[in-house]
């Protein structure tokens, strides 16, 4: 007799869970109760769900599970940043990072085991690509981190918090391993769970999707679930961006900027964040700043300058701090809202661009990288 694989409830958004409970003879309010137990109270035992009928709990125990990915390693940085390495099977692992600050707690989650975009300055891209994560594996990172952090630091924080500061995790950014918009069908239900009042109850302004510029899926996200958007820009012209972000060859800057403008009509914020990794001698000259100013004036945006975090075999160097300061000042003098990201967790390789996990590459990206990364990047101006 064949056994039916239990359904992992972490992978179901409100509609999917309501439909499932309905198939089992339950009412919609039962699905809402169940969703609150799973995502708000971080419960993984159906026996603990005391306001559910006993026979329904028994049914759940037979047919469903609440199961996050196994954690292989947890690391803590001297600055309070925490990183988890989750086992996704078959020799692959992904990384998730929690960044505590005085006014917020940000969780950076992954959407793929590896990444096919292969940005030149990103450690994840250097590892290659294995597979997309399932919704349960994406939301499971949030579920696990919330559960662990509330147990570890939640009580102390909540005791001293005001009414508006009761969350350990107040912001979620999809800036970990992978390109979220190339795993859209699994990412979308995860986003909806983050926003759902019976799920994690985050506002659209506090959930950010970062993309390297998958234009058609940016348009879909604007219609389906318009959260805050960050775009990995990293170059002010097509010639240089073709080298740094190969996806630019498919969706060049003109198309990308037009998609950003369309997204703004639906976005929860009145600007797009452009991320710009500062690379010594590559994209950090005064001429690059001049070109970037011209680009930034075409769409309402904020520039986030990111110090490059080196990794083996990158062949790249971080821009010196004085150069970053001058570059940022030129942008601000031109009226462009500009911030310089503070590096967090670099002592545990948890900073921007350092997440690598463990990836069994199915795309031969690592082989191609061995050849291509020996070729110097041209310092290109428009």
UniProtKB/Swiss-Prot annotation:
Residues that, per the record, bind S-adenosyl-L-methionine: 178-179, 210, 232-234, 309
Cysteine-cysteine disulfides: 108-352
Catalysed reactions listed for this entry: adenosine(2503) in 23S rRNA + 2 reduced [2Fe-2S]-[ferredoxin] + 2 S-adenosyl-L-methionine = 2-methyladenosine(2503) in 23S rRNA + 5'-deoxyadenosine + L-methionine + 2 oxidized [2Fe-2S]-[ferredoxin] + S-adenosyl-L-homocysteine; adenosine(37) in tRNA + 2 reduced [2Fe-2S]-[ferredoxin] + 2 S-adenosyl-L-methionine = 2-methyladenosine(37) in tRNA + 5'-deoxyadenosine + L-methionine + 2 oxidized [2Fe-2S]-[ferredoxin] + S-adenosyl-L-homocysteine
Cofactor: record remark: Binds 1 [4Fe-4S] cluster. The cluster is coordinated with 3 cysteines and an exchangeable S-adenosyl-L-methionine.
Binding of [4Fe-4S] cluster, residues: 115, 119, 122
EC number of this enzyme: 2.1.1.192
Keyword terms of this UniProt record: 4Fe-4S, Cytoplasm, Disulfide bond, Iron, Iron-sulfur, Metal-binding, Methyltransferase, rRNA processing, S-adenosyl-L-methionine, Transferase, tRNA processing
Protein's cellular compartments: Cytoplasm
Main localization of the protein described in the UniProt heading: cytoplasm
Record-annotated Radical SAM core domain positions: 101-347
Pfam family of the protein (one): Radical_SAM
Domain of life: Bacteria
Cofactor: [4Fe-4S] cluster
Gene Ontology cellular component list: cytoplasm
Annotated catalytic residues: 95 (proton acceptor), 352 (s-methylcysteine intermediate)
Keyword tRNA processing attached: yes
SUPFAM superfamilies in the cross-refs: Radical SAM enzymes (SSF102114)
Family affiliation: Belongs to the radical SAM superfamily. RlmN family.
Additional comment: Reaction proceeds by a ping-pong mechanism involving intermediate methylation of a conserved cysteine residue.
Function field: Specifically methylates position 2 of adenine 2503 in 23S rRNA and position 2 of adenine 37 in tRNAs. m2A2503 modification seems to play a crucial role in the proofreading step occurring at the peptidyl transferase center and thus would serve to optimize ribosomal fidelity.
Name used for this protein in its record: Dual-specificity RNA methyltransferase RlmN
Lineage: Bacteria, Pseudomonadati, Pseudomonadota, Betaproteobacteria, Burkholderiales
């Amino acid at each position: 007799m064949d056994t039916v694989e239990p359904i992992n409830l972490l992978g179901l958004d409100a509609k999917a869970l309501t439909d499932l409970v309905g198939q089992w003879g339950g009412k919609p309010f039962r699905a809402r109760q169940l969703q609150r137990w799973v995502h708000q109270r971080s419960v993984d035992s159906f026996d603990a769900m005391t306001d559910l009928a006993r026979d329904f709990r028994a049914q759940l125990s037979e047919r469903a599970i609440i199961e996050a990915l196994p954690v292989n390693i947890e690391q803590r940085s001297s600055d309070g940043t925490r990183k988890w390495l989750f086992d996704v099977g078959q020799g692959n692992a992904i990384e998730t990072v929690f960044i505590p600050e005085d006014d917020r707690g940000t969780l950076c989650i992954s959407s793929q085991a590896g990444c096919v975009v292969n940005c030149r300055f990103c450690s994840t891209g250097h590892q290659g690509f294995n597979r997309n994560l399932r919704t349960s594996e994406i939301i499971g990172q949030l579920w696990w981190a919330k559960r662990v952090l509330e147990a570890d630091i939640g009580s102390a924080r909540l005791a001293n918090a005001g009414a508006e500061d009761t969350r350990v995790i107040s912001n979620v950014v999809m800036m970990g391993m992978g390109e979220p918009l190339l795993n859209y069908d699994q990412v979308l239900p995860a986003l909806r769970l983050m926003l759902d009042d019976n799920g994690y109850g985050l506002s659209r302004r506090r959930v950010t999707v970062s993309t390297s510029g998958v234009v058609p899926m940016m348009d879909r996200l604007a219609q389906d679930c318009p959260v805050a958007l960050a775009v990995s820009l990293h170059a002010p012209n097509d010639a240089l961006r073709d080298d740094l972000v190969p996806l630019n060859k498919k969706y060049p800057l003109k198309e990308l900027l037009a998609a950003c403008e369309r997204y703004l009509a639906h976005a929860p914020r009145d600007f797009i964040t452009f991320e710009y990794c500062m690379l010594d001698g590559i994209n950090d000259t005064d001429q690059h700043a001049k070109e970037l100013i011209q680009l930034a004036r075409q769409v309402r945006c904020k520039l986030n300058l990111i110090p490059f975090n080196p990794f083996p075999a990158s062949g790249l160097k971080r821009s010196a701090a004085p150069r970053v300061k001058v570059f940022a000042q030129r942008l601000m003098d031109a009226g462009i809202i500009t911030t310089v990201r503070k590096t967090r967790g670099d002592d545990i390789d948890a900073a921007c661009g350092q997440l690598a996990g463990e990836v069994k590459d199915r795309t031969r990206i690592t082989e191609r990288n061995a050849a291509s990364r020996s070729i110097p990047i041209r310092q290109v101006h428009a």
